[in-house]
């Protein structure tokens, strides 16, 4: 059944899972059961994916991933790719501060993803639940 109420932000690991030779069945089942119009990406994930592609040697795999990143993802998520704006920047500061105060530092990119999810009231879909252990709604379809 399609979830008509919640909206979601995909962590980079959720996006990159799609192009693995054998993607996680739990994540794929969740994606198929979720209304894709309620699923969003952050420019942060696009940056992390670009970095990963740039590190690959020239060849068919890199060419295929470049096409996926430059053409397929932007088309699939048209109007659902979220930028870093003033609200996200302010939420980022709160996120990093909360994690530091709790003795649980968070990486810069993860903090931007958490801040984007908080700002837009989205559930963050990730395999790395311990990276986002403080306030926020998390979903791990891998488990």
Q: What do the predicted segments below correspond to?
A:
Residues 1-3, 114-143:
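Acidic, PIN/NYN-like endoribonuclease modules and their adjacent C-terminal/linker elements
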Residues 35, 77, 134-135:
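Short, structured coil segments at secondary-structure junctions
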Residues 15-16, 47-50, 133, 139:
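Nucleotide phosphate-binding site architecture
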Residues 40, 82, 139:
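General small-molecule cofactor/ligand-binding pocket signal
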Residues 11-12, 27, 49, 92, ...:
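Generic structural signal for small/hydrophobic residues in well-ordered secondary structure
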């Amino acid at each position: 059944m399609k979830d008509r109420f919640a909206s979601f932000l995909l962590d980079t690991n959720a996006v990159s899972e799609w192009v693995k030779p054998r993607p996680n069945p739990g994540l794929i089942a969740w994606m198929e059961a979720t209304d894709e119009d309620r699923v969003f990406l952050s420019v942060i994930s696009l940056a992390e994916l670009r970095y990963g592609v740039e590190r690959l040697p020239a060849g068919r795999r890199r060419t295929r991933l470049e096409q996926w990143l430059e053409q397929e993802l932007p088309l699939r998520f048209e109007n659902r790719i979220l930028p870093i704006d003033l609200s996200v920047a302010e939420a980022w500061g709160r996120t990093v501060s909360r994690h530091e105060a709790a003795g649980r530092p968070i990486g810069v990119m993860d903090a931007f993803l958490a801040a984007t999810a908080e700002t837009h009231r989205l559930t963050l879909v990730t395999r790395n639940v311990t990276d986002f252990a403080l306030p926020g709604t998390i979903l791990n379809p891998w488990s």
